[in-house]
Each structure stands twice: as structure tokens, then as C-alpha cells.
Amino acid sequence: MFAPHSIVCLYLGNLMAGADTSSPLIESRADLIEAMERGCKPEAEWRIGTEHEKHVFHTNPLRPVAYEGENGIRALLAGIEKKTGWHPFYDGENPIGLRNDEVAGGISLEPGGQFELSGAPMADVHGTASELEEHMRVARKVAAPLDIHFLGLGVTPLW
């Protein structure tokens, strides 16, 4: 049997995820298994996707990249948009990412200043590897003249 707070957490989690509030309350292990099984896809529809965050920085002087300016994040996004044809999305007037509408992938600027590839759903890890390789090839090509570099690190460096 689940502890009462576990049931509340599952219920609140469903609410936050936009689930129908008339869904039956999960009160037992069997209820939980049944709910999870309803959400499963057939194996033929299984996909894998990439989430790849990297810090963006300049080397001279060593510092994070500002949003504005001729060598900033906005310029990086504009250059990648031009190379890929992906569509920008905005926070107010400011582009904060690009969407690839053909395959449901994109690039976004994260709150800590990281640059993130949210990959398209792929049939296997080889597809994600190819997608990441192409993303980095384009990003580096656009970034090089801007003196922008990338660092895949799980914590923010001390600049």
C-alpha cells in the first residue's frame, strides 16, 4: 500500500502535467501499474532524444557570452537560423531559441545561459549521435568568427 503522501504526490503530479482531474485516484500498486501501462507505447513507436547543454564563452577575455552585441547569443542564434532555416521563438522581442518544425527538435537558451539542443525523437542512438554531430558542426562554424566556444559541463564554471 502507498503512503498517503505518495498518493497525493502522484495526484498532484498528474494535475501539474495537465492530466484530466476526473482520472481515478491511484490507491494501490495495481492502480499504479495499470496507469503506467495505459501510457506505454508499442515497442515499434519507442524513440530516443538528445538533451545536450553546453556553456557558451569567449576566450579573450575568458567570460560567458552576453546576449546582446555583435559577438553575443543573439548573433549566434541569428547565424544558426540562417544556416539551418529553423524558426526563432521569442521572449518578448528577444529570440531565445530556434525550432526545427520538420523533425520536432530545436535549440534553446537556458536560464543559466547554457545553449541546449533538444533533439528530435530518433529510432536509435545512432540517429541522436548524427544529429548532435551536425548540430555541433553548424554551431561551431557559426560561433568561430564570433569568438564563441562551447563547454559541456554539468556545473557553471567560475569564470
Map each language-model feature to its residues.
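Terminal catalytic/cofactor-binding subdomain
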Residues: 13-159
